[in-house]
């Protein structure tokens, strides 16, 4: 439930952010003009100053309304969102940014619903007439509605928030919002907070004060920088070695997400973030600091560019003090080694993390959750599903099938499949934790297991052990004939796959000593090789990147298996596998330790790749082999470990 609520909040926050982010350059344009041409600033110019007001009162709200509508219903939604926003703009005398964020999606939803109602009901030749007049007529009603109702309502909400903020500031309580901001940021809600909440509030305030501290509350790089520097100097784990580079990227590049995983590794550092943020806000209030416009990304360079003349000291002291407090408190936690008992006890630290951040992890020494599965005796059909059914699920199925066979559990059939093709009569479905929700909708009567590591051999061993304990049930119930039939199905399926296996991995499919800064770059490298060898069309690379956004293709054990979405099958020309070695590693998973040294790209037509994946899986079942494959400089050695003959092309 917690994961579902978090996902809903993230999706809503992302939607709000998506209305602001495409227009952030216009915000910056307005901010620079505001700084340059208004009185008491750098270069007052009475003529140019006339350009500023229309941007904040008309252009920006309409752009937000258009963007919000287009996110729902494309261009038609954007047009209706724009005209709806006009109604609110003319009904008030304040910038209608919040109004645009309401009017845009409202217009989009209404025109989307209208289009669905009239779909396939318009006579040929009348499409353009209906499309144009529908926007005009609906737009008139929405404009009037927004003028009389939505505009005044948003104005009232804005005034209420303004009074509330004034009370908070008057009572010196503003620093306390750090208790909300910093934990929310670590859950990747930073853009939602900055662009969905603080940017509209900041613009509301800037019309009176010429600058606003709300623009700097979330975007301040100080607290995160303090965490990263403390990790670099005092963190003992290997995962902290990269924090020095991360600090440069975060401070100069403004990519705050880079420090979130370091906090999740050691949750006590959340206190350091909160203390740093509280210090920053206190300094901003005390010295009356702030920015003239929203900044994105939250880089020190962007912040300096958006700083009004006369506020450099206030803003810089705010950033520095937040860095100092965050760094010193984090150093203290590292020095006194708070929670030493938890650190030394692996099971306790997992429990500690799960209590603070209840994300279900598979990979503990004990798999007690497997025992919660009911009616092991009735499990005859196990399906491992992923979004496309060609990569991670194929590897997982290969490992489980091998263990099922070695334990002579011939009554159980193991298969892998795309999640949208899940049959409703499945007995047991195994999926990545981010896809389990979809799997339960497709197969509500099946039992479900979530995991994060498809190569976790211990998990499959524990599952098979429980299945093995219940195998006598079949003997007692005289269903040997069914066992024989299922066994024959397994044999026939295996022979069919072998007979159709036209693809064989060779030296042209192996690429050693590759380098990538991040997983996006690594996926592009793999995809480029798939395209170059004629396996896929060029748009398959975009499909691979889209697939990575759904859930990470990190398998565990230093291996990633990127592939396209189920919708991208038409972009596959023929089955192909690309094996790329990244000796320096690429961060692929959700935690800082999820580093892939082997990235295997797959494009599959039908089941032609299954035998190749099976061979790869057998090799990757041995950690020593994975280590050697990660370091070897010989293509022949790679092929030998993959149990195939060297075949030159």
From Swiss-Prot:
Task: Point out residues bearing the modification Phosphohistidine.
Answer: 563
Induction profile: Induced by mannitol. Repressed by MltR.
Report keywords, A-Z. Cell inner membrane, Cell membrane, Kinase, Membrane, Phosphoprotein, Phosphotransferase system, Sugar transport, Transferase, Transmembrane, Transmembrane helix, Transport
The record's listing under InterPro entries reads: PTrfase/Anion_transptr, PTS_EIIA_type-2_dom, PTS_EIIB-like_sf, PTS_EIIB_2, PTS_EIIB_2/3, PTS_EIIB_mannitol, PTS_EIIC, PTS_EIIC_2
| Pfam families named in the record | PTS_EIIA_2, PTS_EIIC, PTS_IIB
The superkingdom listed in its UniProt entry is Bacteria
Q: Which residues carry this modification: Phosphocysteine?
A: 386
Which leading EC class covers this enzyme?
A: transferase
Q: Where is the PTS EIIB type-2 domain?
A: 380-472
- Enumerate the spans annotated as PTS EIIC type-2 domain: 12-340
Reaction catalysed? Answer: D-mannitol(out) + N(pros)-phospho-L-histidyl-[protein] = D-mannitol 1-phosphate(in) + L-histidyl-[protein]
**Post-translational modification summary for this protein:** An intramolecular phosphotransfer takes places between His-563 and Cys-386.
The site (Stabilizes the transition state in the phosphoryl transfer from HPr to EIIA) lies at: 547
- State the GO CC annotations: plasma membrane
Picking any one GO biological process from the record gives:
phosphoenolpyruvate-dependent sugar phosphotransferase system
Q: Which GO terms describe its molecular function?
A: kinase activity; protein-N(PI)-phosphohistidine-mannitol phosphotransferase system transmembrane transporter activity; protein-phosphocysteine-sugar phosphotransferase activity
SUPFAM superfamilies, from UniProt? Answer: Phoshotransferase/anion transport protein (SSF55804), PTS system IIB component-like (SSF52794)
Q: What is known of its domains?
A: The EIIC type-2 domain forms the PTS system translocation channel and contains the specific substrate-binding site. The PTS EIIB type-2 domain is phosphorylated by phospho-EIIA on a cysteinyl residue. Then, it transfers the phosphoryl group to the sugar substrate concomitantly with the sugar uptake processed by the PTS EIIC type-2 domain.
Matching PANTHER family: MANNITOL PERMEASE IIC COMPONENT, PTS SYSTEM MANNITOL-SPECIFIC EIICBA COMPONENT
Name the record gives this protein:
PTS system mannitol-specific EIICBA component
Q: What is the name of the gene encoding this protein? A: mtlA
């Amino acid at each position: 439930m917690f994961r579902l609520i978090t996902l809903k909040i993230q999706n809503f926050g992302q939607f709000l952010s998506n209305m602001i982010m495409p227009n952030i350059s216009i915000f910056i344009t307005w901010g620079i003009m505001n700084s340059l041409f208004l009185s008491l600033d750098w270069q007052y110019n009475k003529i140019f100053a006339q350009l500023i007001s229309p941007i904040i009162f008309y252009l920006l709200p309409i752009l937000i309304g258009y963007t919000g509508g287009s996110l729902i219903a494309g261009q038609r939604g954007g047009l209706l969102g724009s005209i709806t926003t006009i109604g609110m703009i003319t009904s008030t005398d304040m910038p209608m940014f919040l109004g645009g964020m309401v009017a845009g999606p409202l217009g989009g939803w209404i025109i989307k619903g209208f289009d669905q109602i009239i779909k396939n009901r318009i006579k040929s030749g009348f499409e353009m007439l209906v499309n144009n007049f529908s926007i005009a007529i609906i737009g008139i009603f929405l404009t009037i509605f927004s003028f009389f109702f939505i505009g005044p309502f948003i104005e009232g909400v804005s005034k209420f928030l303004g009074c509330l903020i004034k009370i908070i500031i008057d009572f010196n309580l503003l620093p306390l919002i750090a208790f909300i901001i910093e934990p929310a940021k670590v859950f990747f809600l930073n853009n939602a907070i900055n662009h969905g909440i603080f940017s509209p509030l900041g613009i509301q305030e800037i019309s009176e004060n010429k600058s606003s501290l709300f623009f700097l509350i979330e975007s301040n790089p100080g607290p995160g920088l303090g965490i990263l520097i403390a990790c670099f100097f005092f963190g003992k784990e290997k995962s902290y070695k990269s924090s020095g580079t991360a600090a440069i990227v975060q401070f100069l590049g403004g990519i705050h997400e880079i420090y979130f995983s370091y906090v999740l590794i050691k949750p006590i550092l959340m206190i350091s973030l909160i203390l740093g943020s509280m210090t920053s806000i206190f300094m901003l209030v005390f010295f009356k600091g702030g920015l003239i416009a929203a900044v994105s990304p939250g880089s020190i360079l962007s912040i300096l560019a958006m700083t009004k003349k006369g506020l450099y000291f206030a803003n810089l002291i705010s950033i520095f003090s937040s860095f100092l407090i965050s760094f010193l408190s984090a150093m203290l936690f590292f020095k006194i080694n708070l929670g030493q008992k938890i650190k030394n006890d692996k099971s306790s630290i997992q429990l500690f993390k799960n209590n603070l951040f209840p994300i279900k992890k598979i990979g503990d020494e004990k798999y007690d959750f497997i025992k919660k599965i009911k009616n092991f005796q009735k499990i005859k059909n196990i399906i491992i599903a992923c979004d496309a059914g060609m990569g991670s699920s194929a590897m997982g199925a290969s490992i489980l099938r091998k263990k099922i066979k070695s334990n002579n559990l011939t009554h159980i059939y193991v298969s892998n499949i795309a999640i949208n093709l899940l049959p409703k009569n499945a007995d047991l479905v195994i999926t990545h934790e981010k896809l389990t929700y979809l799997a339960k909708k497709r197969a509500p009567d099946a039992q479900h297991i979530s995991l994060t590591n498809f190569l976790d051999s211990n998990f499959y061993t524990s599952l098979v052990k429980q299945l093995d304990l219940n195998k006598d049930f079949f003997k007692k119930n005289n269903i040997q004939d069914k066992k024989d039939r299922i066994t024959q199905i397994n044999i026939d399926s295996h022979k069919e796959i072998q007979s159709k296996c036209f693809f064989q991995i060779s030296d042209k499919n192996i690429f050693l000593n590759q380098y990538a800064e991040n997983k996006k770059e690594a996926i592009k490298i793999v995809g480029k090789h798939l395209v170059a060898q004629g396996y896929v069309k060029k748009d398959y690379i975009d499909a691979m990147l889209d697939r990575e956004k759904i859930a990470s293709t990190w398998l565990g054990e230093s291996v990633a298996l990127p592939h396209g979405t189920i919708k991208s099958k038409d972009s596959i020309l023929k089955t192909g596998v690309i094996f790329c070695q990244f000796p320096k590693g690429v961060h692929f998973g959700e935690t800082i330790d999820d580093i892939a040294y082997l990235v295997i790209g797959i494009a599959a037509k039908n089941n032609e790749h299954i035998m190749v994946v099976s061979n790869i899986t057998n090799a990757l079942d041995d950690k020593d082999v994975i280590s050697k494959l990660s370091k070897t400089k010989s293509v022949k050695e790679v092929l030998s470990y993959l149990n195939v003959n060297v075949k030159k092309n």
